[in-house]
């Protein structure tokens, strides 16, 4: 069991795995995966939300007791992202938002300039902002300085499954951050999630790695276990890396007691 909770702004969560909902073939498959993951916080694209209720995604999250985290997926400018966040606040009655401002459809990488502009406006408007950002320590610090409640650097581009391509930068972000760091995007399998936590991240957000797996529920369970294992390993402290081997058992030295020589 994870020994302490994930705290972002004024909310605490027992699970350090945040799930996305994109890519699931249907709600039944998504439900199985969400239950298996143990997540308590799940992103939803506001453009997919049926604000009138019904039997859709929001009803599912409500039945499972999972907090929805609206995101601004698909937005290409600060103005568009701010408007989408404001619509989400009205539709879902929450001031939390996962902020995404994408530079282009080919890479789905964040537009750093528009991202900071949107973050500044949303923080001023009373939002709890969780920005999806590049693995850039300087940009992460700038977002924190604007008042973001967490920073969410990518491991690799969305949906690639390449894992963490620049672990050193993630470590630098963790080392200088005064807010939670959530590894977001690029996770391909459980070992990637474990590595993120070992590098010092406070949580992992993933979607495609689960929703497009051959067995989404099984992969969700694996991701949950990996996040816990990586977190506990980080707290336990890994041994230093060494160039040469070092025996784990002490060398035994056999000596004769005084007067034991033959003939005496």
Curated annotation (Swiss-Prot):
**Native source species:** Mycobacterium marinum (strain ATCC BAA-535 / M)
Question: Which GO terms of the molecular function aspect are on file?
Answer: thiazole synthase activity
UniProt: 1-deoxy-D-xylulose 5-phosphate binding residues: 159, 185-186, 207-208
Can you cite an annotated GO cellular component?
Answer: cytoplasm
Q: Per the similarity annotation, which family is this?
A: Belongs to the ThiG family.
InterPro entries, alphabetized: Aldolase_TIM, Thiazole_synthase_ThiG, ThiG
Q: Where in the cell is it found?
A: Cytoplasm
Q: How does this chain assemble?
A: Homotetramer. Forms heterodimers with either ThiH or ThiS.
The catalytic activity of this protein is classed by the Enzyme Commission as 2.8.1.10
Q: What does this protein do?
A: Catalyzes the rearrangement of 1-deoxy-D-xylulose 5-phosphate (DXP) to produce the thiazole phosphate moiety of thiamine. Sulfur is provided by the thiocarboxylate moiety of the carrier protein ThiS. In vitro, sulfur can be provided by H(2)S.
One biological process term in Gene Ontology:
thiamine diphosphate biosynthetic process
Enzyme class, first EC level, given as a word: transferase
Q: Which cysteines are joined by disulfide bonds?
A: none
Q: In which pathway does it act?
A: Cofactor biosynthesis; thiamine diphosphate biosynthesis
Arranged from A to Z, the UniProt key words for this protein are: Cytoplasm, Schiff base, Thiamine biosynthesis, Transferase
Catalytic reaction list: [ThiS sulfur-carrier protein]-C-terminal-Gly-aminoethanethioate + 2-iminoacetate + 1-deoxy-D-xylulose 5-phosphate = [ThiS sulfur-carrier protein]-C-terminal Gly-Gly + 2-[(2R,5Z)-2-carboxy-4-methylthiazol-5(2H)-ylidene]ethyl phosphate + 2 H2O + H(+)
Catalytic residues, chain numbering = 98 (schiff-base intermediate with dxp)
Q: What is this protein called?
A: Thiazole synthase
